[in-house]
């Protein structure tokens, strides 16, 4: 029968092929089921399908794996200490509902009215009222740490529940009641520790809280819950469980499958509140616990005071007293007319005398330059002028000589004898009108400071002599004018350069000490050393010569005269001194420099000739030279005869030896005299040659100076005709000495001369740089040519070697 005919309406169901279907009717077992996550991926992998999935598609953390943490530390921001947790190594699935469980923030009973406070009954809660908002905030926030006093007591050994003080109370505490067992325990305890001392028990003092509002006694504010929602009562108390809420993480992470139920924990059925920790025996009397002792106080109130205070009545204010102070101004109109005119033109000292004050000079007052503070004077100090006036009034005045002697020998520095001695010499020099030189044991800075202090200690008469002394200390002429004149005068006079110069006493002492090999203070030399400014700054020491540009030991350094007398330096000196700097003056300087260079060359030649002569004499007789240098004036040496030495050392034979010795001495004296005569003749010849050369140089310089003067006179006549040229500086002969010859050229200013010098220096530098570049380019070209030639030689040698090898092969 055909079934298709039976389906008149709709679509017919397909036939189930029971034979072809392979679906088993048995349910799948638990170990065969596959646990999947939210996304349908397999949750467990690995050994026996018991491990978690390995994160992002079987990787750890992310695509790249764990991202390493960066550690950074600096001075401003120190590196934080990273504390690792188990959650740092877990994936999102481990923290989900199948993992360690969700975390939720829960309220605890530590702060404010939480769950623990709500679970309490009405009679278990605090009796204090929380009607005000401030009290509610105080209850919410509680101090975490105790006060400083409690912490100090705990560190000293105090524990809560015990009294404060020494453990000096001996008493028998009845523990466990009056039973036989308790008595036996107390007897055994007394045998073990008979001298045991019990500390005082702390009796709590109940603090009374004052009522702040207008409510009655025992009033409590309304709670948030209404009366209808109140669930507290006897039934809730009976059903109240002692279980506490679990902390932190819920659920288990390991050991339990996803399709299994969790076993009951053994440790969650019991609570510590179910155990009794008291040691009291059941049925014991509670009277002993109710007994309280009196507080032992170490302070007692004394009825009488040992030193009672005295209280004084306040001063009475007069009835006419006014709080505002109004000074009465001085009425100048009442002064006489003469005094009014004199007051306008008064000096500081005159004003001090007029007002009756002590005579104080500007040095004693101490201006901005003085570093030492002025000494404050009291009204009880007896002044020297007042003492003199009193003595004169009484008629017993001292003589002028005694007074002068007392002022000269006055002691201003009793604690410093060296400074007092210098002050005494300073006074002696000032009274004579001479400047006191700088002591050798003081630096420039120290002497300037001490000099100001000495000047402040002078009297008015002595201070009046200071300007004259200071004017004498200054040079008569400025260095720019005096230096060329000094050079001209030095060129006219010549020093002796022969070997007959007398050696000073110091040099003689040094030579004698060197011969005796006694090296020490006599053979030493002392020089002034100028340190660098940077060195003094590094050692944090004041510079001994402030403001000086010299560095090192100038006495041992070679002076470069050419560098000193450069045109730029000459212009700089004249600019600082304010002298007229003209082209004529520069020409004069150039001529002087040329003459000085010629003189230096001649002196070098002369010294070389002297050295050659000395070498010849040294070869002849070195001992005779030393004796002749010590005695250049042909004086006989006071020397003991040879017979005296022979008699001491045992080499003499009598009269024959004396005669022979006398003959030898006469022959030696004749030889010495001949040598001295030869030396004198040589010296005379040299002097004549030197004098001739110097006369020629002088004549030549004089001619040049005359020519310059004639040229200057011609230029002056032309300048008088020309009105366009202006004279910048006109100096008098009295202020700067004889005037310089006028120049015909237009006068150059200081800045123009310096600019010209700078241009010349720049041109020289450019020329040097160009020359160096040319040299470098030539060297580079030469090196390139050499390299090319070497390459050619190497290639040619290689070709030759190849040809030779071919030839050898052909021969073979």
Curated annotation (Swiss-Prot):
Here the segments flagged for biased composition (Basic residues) are 761-794
Q: Cross-referenced Pfam families, in alphabetical order?
A: DUF1604 (PF07713), G-patch (PF01585)
Listed GO MF terms: RNA binding
Record-level GO cellular component terms: nucleus
Domain G-patch stretches: 145-191
Q: Which InterPro entries match?
A: DUF1604, G_patch_dom
Tell me the segments the record calls region Disordered. Answer: 1-42, 384-416, 584-812
Q: Where is the composition biased (Basic and acidic residues)?
A: 29-40, 586-609, 669-720
Q: Membrane-spanning regions, if any?
A: none
Name the PANTHER family on file.
G PATCH DOMAIN-CONTAINING PROTEIN 1 (PTHR13384:SF19)
State the name under which the record lists this protein: G patch domain-containing protein 1 homolog
């Amino acid at each position: 029968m055909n079934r298709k005919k039976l389906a008149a309406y709709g679509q017919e169901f397909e036939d189930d092929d029971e034979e072809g279907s392979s679906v088993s009717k048995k349910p799948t077992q638990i170990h065969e089921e596959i646990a999947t996550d939210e996304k349908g991926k397999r949750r467990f992998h690995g050994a026996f399908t018991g491990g978690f999935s390995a994160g992002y598609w079987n990787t750890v953390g992310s695509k790249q794996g764990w991202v390493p943490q960066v550690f950074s530390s600096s001075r401003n921001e120190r590196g934080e200490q990273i504390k690792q947790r188990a959650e740092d190594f877990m994936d999102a699935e481990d923290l989900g509902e199948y993992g360690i469980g969700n975390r939720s923030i829960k309220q605890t009973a530590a702060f404010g009215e939480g769950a623990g406070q709500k679970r309490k009954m009405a009679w278990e809660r605090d009796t204090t009222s929380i009607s005000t908002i401030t009290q509610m905030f105080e209850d919410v926030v509680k101090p975490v740490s105790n006060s400083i006093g409690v912490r100090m007591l705990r560190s000293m050994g105090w524990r809560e529940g015990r009294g404060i003080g020494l453990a000096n109370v001996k008493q028998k505490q009845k523990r466990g009641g009056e039973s036989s067992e308790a008595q036996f325990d107390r007897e055994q305890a007394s045998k073990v520790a008979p001298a045991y001392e019990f500390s005082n028990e702390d009796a709590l003092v109940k603090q009374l809280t004052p009522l702040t509002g207008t409510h009655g006694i025992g009033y409590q504010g309304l709670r948030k819950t209404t009366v209808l929602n109140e669930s507290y009562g006897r039934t809730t108390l009976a059903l109240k469980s002692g279980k506490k809420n679990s902390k932190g993480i819920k659920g288990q992470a390991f050991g339990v499958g996803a399709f299994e139920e969790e076993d009951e924990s053994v440790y969650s059925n019991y609570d510590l509140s179910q155990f009794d920790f008291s040691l009291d025996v059941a049925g014991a009397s509670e009277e002993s616990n109710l007994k309280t002792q009196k507080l032992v106080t170490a302070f007692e109130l004394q009825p009488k005071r040992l030193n009672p205070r005295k209280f004084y009545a306040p001063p009475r204010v007069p009835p006419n007293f006014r709080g505002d102070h109004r000074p009465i101004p001085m009425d100048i109109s009442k002064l006489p007319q003469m005094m009014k005119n004199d007051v306008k033109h008064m000096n500081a000292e005159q004003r001090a005398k007029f007002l009756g004050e002590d005579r104080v000079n500007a040095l004693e007052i101490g201006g901005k330059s003085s570093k030492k503070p002025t000494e404050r004077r009291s009204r009880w100090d007896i002044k020297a002028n007042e003492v003199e006036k009193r003595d004169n009034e009484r008629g017993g005045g001292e003589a002028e000589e005694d007074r002068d002697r007392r002022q000269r020998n006055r002691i201003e520095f009793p604690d410093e004898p060296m400074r007092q001695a210098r002050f005494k010499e300073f006074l002696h020099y000032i009274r004579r009108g001479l400047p006191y030189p700088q002591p050798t044991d003081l630096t420039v800075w120290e002497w300037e400071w001490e000099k100001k202090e000495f000047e402040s200690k002078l009297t008015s008469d002595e201070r009046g002599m200071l300007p004259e002394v200071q004017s004498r200390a200054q040079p008569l002429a400025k260095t720019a004018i005096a230096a060329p004149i000094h050079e001209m005068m030095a060129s006219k006079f010549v020093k002796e350069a022969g070997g007959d110069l007398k050696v000073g006493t110091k040099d003689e002492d040094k030579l004698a000490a060197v011969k005796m090999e006694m090296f020490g203070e006599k053979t030493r030399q002392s020089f002034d050393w100028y340190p660098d400014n940077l060195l003094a700054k590094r050692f944090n020491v004041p510079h001994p010569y402030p403001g000086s540009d010299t560095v090192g030991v100038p006495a041992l350094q070679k002076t470069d005269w050419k560098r000193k007398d450069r045109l730029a330096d000459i212009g700089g000196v004249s600019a600082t001194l304010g002298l007229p700097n003209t082209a004529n003056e520069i020409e004069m300087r150039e001529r002087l420099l040329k003459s000085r260079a010629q003189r230096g060359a001649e002196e070098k030649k002369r010294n070389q000739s002297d050295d050659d002569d000395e070498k010849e004499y040294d070869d002849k007789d070195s001992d005779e030279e030393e004796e002749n240098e010590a005695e250049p004036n042909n004086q006989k040496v006071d020397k003991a005869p040879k017979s005296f030495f022979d008699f001491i050392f045992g080499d003499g034979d009598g009269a024959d030896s004396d005669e022979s010795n006398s003959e030898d001495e006469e022959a030696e004296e004749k030889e010495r005299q001949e040598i001295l005569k030869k030396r004198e003749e040589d010296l005379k010849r040299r002097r004549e040659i030197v004098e001739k050369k110097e006369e020629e140089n002088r004549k030549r310089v004089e001619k040049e100076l005359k020519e310059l003067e004639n040229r200057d006179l011609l230029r002056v006549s032309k300048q008088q005709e020309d009105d366009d040229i202006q004279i910048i500086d006109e100096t008098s002969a009295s202020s700067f000495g004889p005037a310089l010859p006028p120049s015909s050229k237009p006068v150059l200013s200081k800045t123009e001369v310096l600019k010209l010098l700078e241009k010349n220096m720049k041109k020289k530098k450019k020329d040097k740089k160009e020359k160096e570049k040319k040299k470098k380019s030539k060297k580079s070209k030469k090196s390139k040519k050499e390299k090319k030639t070497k390459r050619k030689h190497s290639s040619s040698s290689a070709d030759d070697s190849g040809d030779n090898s071919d030839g050898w092969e052909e021969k073979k």
